[in-house]
Amino acid sequence: MAKEKYDRSKPHVNIGTIGHVDHGKTTLTAAITTVLARRLPSSVNQPKDYASIDAAPEERERGITINTAHVEYETEKRHYAHIDAPGHADYVKNMITGAAQMDGAILVVASTDGPMPQTREHILLSRQVGVKHLIVFMNKVDLVDDEELLELVEMEIRDLLSEYDFPGDDLPVIQGSALKALEGDSKYEDIVMELMNTVDEYIPEPERDTDKPLLLPVEDVFSITGRGTVASGRIDRGIVKVNDEIEIVGIKEETQKAVVTGVEMFRKQLDEGLAGDNVGVLLRGVQRDEIERGQVIAKPGSINPHTKFKGEVYILTKEEGGRHTPFFNNYRPQFYFRTTDVTGSIELPAGTEMVMPGDNVTIDVELIHPIAVEQGTTFSIREGGRTVGSGMVTEIEA
C-alpha cells in the first residue's frame, strides 16, 4: 500500500490516558494504536507495543524529570497526539507543570477494582489544571461475569466524577478490554473503534492559539530615537497587528494602554505577528521607563494583574536538584512567571504542617507585586536562581 501524505487539514487534538496504576492505561494506548493501524492503515497509524510505550524516555521540563510516552495516530476525522506516563508521579508532574496540555483525556478504570485512590487524584488534577472533557473506559470487562457488578462500578465512577464537577451523569462510559483488543479479538477491536469515535465526537476541537486573545510576555525593551519604544518577546497566543490597541499588564498597580505602530521580526517590518513568533513591537505613547521585562502586552481586558491566587504545585526531590528539607507555612521563595521572578509567601492548607520534597500540594500565594495571571498560568518556584518547584494557577483570589 502506498504511503499517504501527512494530512495537515485534519484538526489536531491532544489527549492522554489517566487513571490508577495497573488499570490498563498503557495497554489501552497500545490497543488504540494497534487497532487503528489494522482498521485505518496510514503512514501515521503505526502499531506501538506495550514495551515501547512503557519505556518512555526521560524528559526535562522546567528542571523536572518526567517520563512520558508520546504516540500519534489518526481517525478519519482527526489527528491525535496521545500522552501516556508510566508512573503516578509522572502524571502529577505532567499535569501540574503543563508539560502535557490535554484537550481531553480517557480515564481508564479496571472493572475488577472500580475507582481507586489515584483514579480520584487524577480526576481532581484534571479539574484543577483545566482538562474539561473526560471519557471513561471501563477496562478488563472480560474478567467480570456479573453484569450487576459492572453497573455498580459504572455508577461509582459517575458519582466520583460528579463530585469533582464533571458531568458524571452525561459523560460517555465505554466498556471493553484493552488486552483482548490488542490480541486481535474483533468484538473488542470494535469497542476500541467505538471509543475513538466517541473521542472524535465528545472532545471538542481546541481553539487555535491564533484565535485566542493576544498575550506577549515582554523580554526586552529599548527605545529607537524618533520612533518610540520597542518591546520584544515571543507571542504566547493571539495575533498582534499594526494599529492595535493593547494593554501593558503586571508589576505596576495601573494597567497602561498603548497603540502598536510597528511589528518587526528578524529586522523586517510585518503587518502582523502570530502566536509563536519572536517579535519586536513598536509602541506609541509609552516611555522607555514605563514598560519592563515581566510585564505582558495583551488584548485590552483579557488579563488582569493579581497578587493572590491558589496554585497546585509539585515540589522537586533532592535528586531532581530541589530542596533537601521540607518547607513550612509562610515560606517565601521567588515565583518565576514567564520572564521574571517575583517574591511571594506561601500559605499551606489547613492541617498541612509542612511540604516534603517530592510532594504535590494546593497552596495560597501572595506576591509582593502584581503579575498578569489567570487560571492555567504556569510558574516555577525558585530559591536563589534554582528551581525547587513547579505549579499552575488554579484560582484567582485578588
UniProtKB/Swiss-Prot annotation:
One of its GO terms (biological process) is translational elongation. Residues 19-26 are annotated as: G1. One of its GO terms (molecular function) is translation elongation factor activity. One of its GO terms (cellular component) is cytoplasm. It holds the Pfam family GTP_EFTU_D2. Keywords: Cytoplasm, Elongation factor, GTP-binding, Hydrolase, Magnesium, Metal-binding, Nucleotide-binding, Protein biosynthesis. Residues 84-87 are annotated as: G3. GTP binds at residues 19-26, 84-88, 139-142. Residues 139-142 are annotated as: G4. Its main location: cytoplasm. It catalyses: GTP + H2O = GDP + phosphate + H(+). SUPFAM superfamilies: EF-Tu/eEF-1alpha/eIF2-gamma C-terminal domain, P-loop containing nucleoside triphosphate hydrolases, Translation proteins. Belongs to the TRAFAC class translation factor GTPase superfamily. Classic translation factor GTPase family. EF-Tu/EF-1A subfamily. This is Elongation factor Tu. It comes from Streptococcus pneumoniae (strain ATCC BAA-255 / R6). The gene is tuf.
